[in-house]
Amino acid sequence: FTPTSGQVLYDGRDFVKMSKKEKVAMRREMGMIFQNAALFDSLSVLENVMFPLDMFSNMTYRDRVKRAQECLDRVNLIDAQQKFPGEISGGMQKRVAIARAIVLNPKYLFCDEPNSGLDPRTSLVIDELLSSITKEFDITTIINTHDMNSVMGIGDNIAFIYKGHKEWQGNKDEVMHRSE
């Protein structure tokens, strides 16, 4: 899409003016976790995690497998690598999605309702995993959620958006003491 007004900037560069090569390089720096796990049913857990490497890296097959296994191990799913998405729970599918999102060592991670459809205990596991991974790998993370427990558990800088407009922004203490 071509913007009708304004600009889309990525690290200070105008997205619309970027070359295809620059956009591919930019894509390598971004991880995405969707509301549903968005896994390929016909691919194993390992193959799902390897998918971004297949698309955006020049690594050998052996190195791609090794990197994907490292990410699966990080989300405690190394034993599920040969299973298919339909054979694992929703919480496990979310962890596969997290492994896939971090496999390229992104600078930025975008999460759309990462706890959607999960029970409270599994939601807490996902929150703790996202929090520890983003700190461990120094990933700037943007999470879109309606779950205020999740927001207060893992949010550092919180923005409240209503009908497409930022109503307010602050840290956890400012959110807790907000009177509006």
Residue map of PLM features:
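Catalytic Walker B motif of ABC-type/P-loop ATPase nucleotide-binding domains
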Residues: 109-112
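Conserved ABC ATPase "signature" region
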Residues: 13-14, 61-79
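A short, proline-enriched helix->beta-strand linker immediately N-terminal to the Walker B motif
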Residues: 103-107
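Conserved ABC transporter NBD signature motif
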Residues: 6-14
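Conserved ABC ATPase signature
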Residues: 84-88, 92
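Helix N-cap at the start of a conserved alpha-helix in ABC-type nucleotide-binding domains
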Residues: 120-122
